[in-house]
């Protein structure tokens, strides 16, 4: 059991979350207050909201809340970079001022009451704690089925994932330092974090309905996320098409020998239907194979450019404000104090 009280930062990526922000901030503040009262975390623990280039009033709400509530702070990214990179920005920022960091989405679907269980596991010596959904009853049939298929496929491809785990997890400082050593531009944290190793534990919870607003992960984003996960961690799809190519070559050779023998025996068939079907079949396979190779080439292209993953516009966490931003904060403080 750890004796000292660790500094905890809860990192919450946000994109157009004005409908749910106030409730999320309120509930997380209550959790932090309870943990401080139980002496499970230090009094200077924080809730860090990361605004991922929102188009609504999300950042204004974060800035105002940081004035009213000293446990709340914010990080504003210069533009929308996506959930994974926004989350990584928060983790990087929180690492230097925290003993442990918990990441959670802003929609309140993850059960915040188990954050206490996360901290108990941390005090027992766990360096990474995964929040695992007990069931997916709140998901639609389509999402539940596709998610199950995705996890099974990833396991078949040899990719180590925590089943029914998203990005609700605790990481201590040492594991966050290890995470910084992974330079991937195409982030798939659900695959990267288990690779770090270290002592870990799982905490089960029941996933709730979204408190308000609409999901920020439509089908298009989910498919892109899945493809990114596969191409970032496995070359099995390319090997599959290589093997399929050898099999089709063998079958075509057998068919060619058979046709030659029939020709020698004087048996000839027009075979237009079979010819057209085989051409379309092989053409489709070739296009699929080219598409998969293209995905890998695109992934390589993104990686070799080594572009920064995000740019920070305003950092309330470290008070790195320009004179104009400082004036705006002072104006808000006068207005809401």
UniProtKB/Swiss-Prot annotation:
Protein name in the entry: Uncharacterized glycosyltransferase YkoT
Record keywords: Cell membrane, Glycosyltransferase, Membrane, Transferase, Transmembrane, Transmembrane helix
Alphabetized Gene3D superfamilies for the sequence: Spore Coat Polysaccharide Biosynthesis Protein SpsA, Chain A
Database matches in SUPFAM superfamilies: Nucleotide-diphospho-sugar transferases
Name of the top EC class for this enzyme: transferase
InterPro entries linked: Glyco_trans_2-like, Glycosyltransferase_2, Nucleotide-diphossugar_trans
Topology of the protein relative to the lipid bilayer: Multi-pass membrane protein
Entry's EC annotation: 2.4.-.-
Entry's localization field: Cell membrane
Origin superkingdom: Bacteria
């Amino acid at each position: 059991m750890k004796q000292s009280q660790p500094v905890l930062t809860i990192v919450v990526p946000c994109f157009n979350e004005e409908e749910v922000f106030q409730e999320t901030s309120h509930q997380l503040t209550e959790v932090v207050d309870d943990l401080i009262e139980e002496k499970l975390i230090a009094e200077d623990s924080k809730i860090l909201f990361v605004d991922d280039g929102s188009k609504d009033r999300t950042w204004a709400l974060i800035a105002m809340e940081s004035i009213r509530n000293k446990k709340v702070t914010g990080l504003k990214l210069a533009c929308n970079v996506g959930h994974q990179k926004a989350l990584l920005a928060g983790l990087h920022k929180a690492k230097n001022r925290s003993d442990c960091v918990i990441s959670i989405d802003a929609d309140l679907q993850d059960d915040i009451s188990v954050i206490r269980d996360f901290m108990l596991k941390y005090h027992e010596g766990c360096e990474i704690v995964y929040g695992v959904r007990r069931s997916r009853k709140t998901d639609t049939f389509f999402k539940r089925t596709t998610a199950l298929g995705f996890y099974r496929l990833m396991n078949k491809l040899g990719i180590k994932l925590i089943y029914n785990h998203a990005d609700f997890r605790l990481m201590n400082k040492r594991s966050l330092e290890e995470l910084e050593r992974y330079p991937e531009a195409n982030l798939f944290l659900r695959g990267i974090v288990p690779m770090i190793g270290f002592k870990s534990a799982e905490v089960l919870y029941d996933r709730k309905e979204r408190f308000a607003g609409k999901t920020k992960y439509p089908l298009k984003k989910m498919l892109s996320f899945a493809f990114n996960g596969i191409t970032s961690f496995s070359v099995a799809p390319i090997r599959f098409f290589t093997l399929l190519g050898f099999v089709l070559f063998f079958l075509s050779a057998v068919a060619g020998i058979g046709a030659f023998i029939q020709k020698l025996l004087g048996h000839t068939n027009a075979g237009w239907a079979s010819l057209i079907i085989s051409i379309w079949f092989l053409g489709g396979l070739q296009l699929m194979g080219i598409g998969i190779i293209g995905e890998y080439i695109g992934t390589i292209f993104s990686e070799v450019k080594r572009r920064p993953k995000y740019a920070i516009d305003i950092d309330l966490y470290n008070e790195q404000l320009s004179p104009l931003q400082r004036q705006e904060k002072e104006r808000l403080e006068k207005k809401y104090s």
